[in-house]
Amino acid sequence: MIKLGTHLSIAKGFANAAETAVYIGANTFQFFSRNPRGGNAKEFDEKDIIKFQEIRKENNFAPLLAHAPYTMNLGGTKDDVYEFATRVIDEDIRRMDSLGIEYMCFHPGSHVGGGVDFGIDRIVKGLNNAIKGDENITILLETMSGKGTEIGFKFEQLKSIIDKIEHKEKIGVCLDTCHIFSAGYDIVNDLDGVLEEFDKVIGIERLKTVHLNDSMMPFGDKKDRHAPIGEGKIGLKALIDFMEHPSLKHLPFFLETPFDDEGHKRELKMIKEILSSK
């Protein structure tokens, strides 16, 4: 069975998000581990969490994915920004693990002029301080588009981070189709080649989740602009082929497309109908 969901808001609680997932035809979902542009995290509501776990179990949800906030930058030069990022990643690993969330992804960071090697060293230090080794959750580095001074738009950069992680069994990769297309990996015309390169550089076993997004921007443009599935430069056929690839079809897929719940419901229905007709 395909593991397919979208990004959902938990502003009205985890149970509400889980109910929304069921309503739109998803069997998993992604959510922000805290306000994506804010600071402190809200305390969990016990009744909400109990109901959330019941819905999750009753509907046999696939692995869930938390997304760390955008304000978190482990790769930069400003010490106050770095200290905030290290606190957030440490807290949110603990918070998400307590809920039994299987994965948490994050944007590795931007070096903002410090240089790639400097940024990677900062990211590694932050992760090694946060990952204790006794967690059940797996932390995922997200593939990036390469805008500005982003780190993680080349597979080699992700490998450089992973190689220095102490508890390597707790680290993986979340592949974003829009991002890698924008970064110059041709998943439209050479998907096998891209996956072979990923396997050679990082190891395909490290790939745990997929952000399934089309791209508003052309190939190699290094800009992060998501488009609805089939309405961008990647196209419907390439994204369906991606989902059906033998090395990928077992993974959970999460849409981050610019739709509301009703739009996502239609989008999920379209994808499932195409997959089931083959």
From Swiss-Prot:
GO terms for biological process: base-excision repair. Zn(2+) 3 binds at residues 179, 224, 226. It is an enzyme of class 3 (hydrolase). This is Probable endonuclease 4. CDD domains: AP2Ec (cd00019). Zn(2+) 2 binds at residues 142, 176, 211, 256. The keyword DNA repair applies. Its cofactor is Zn(2+). Zn(2+) 1 binds at residues 67, 107, 142. It catalyses: Endonucleolytic cleavage to 5'-phosphooligonucleotide end-products. One of its GO terms (molecular function) is phosphoric diester hydrolase activity. Endonuclease IV plays a role in DNA repair. It cleaves phosphodiester bonds at apurinic or apyrimidinic (AP) sites, generating a 3'-hydroxyl group and a 5'-terminal sugar phosphate. Belongs to the AP endonuclease 2 family. SUPFAM superfamilies: Xylose isomerase-like. Its EC number is 3.1.21.2. Binds 3 Zn(2+) ions.
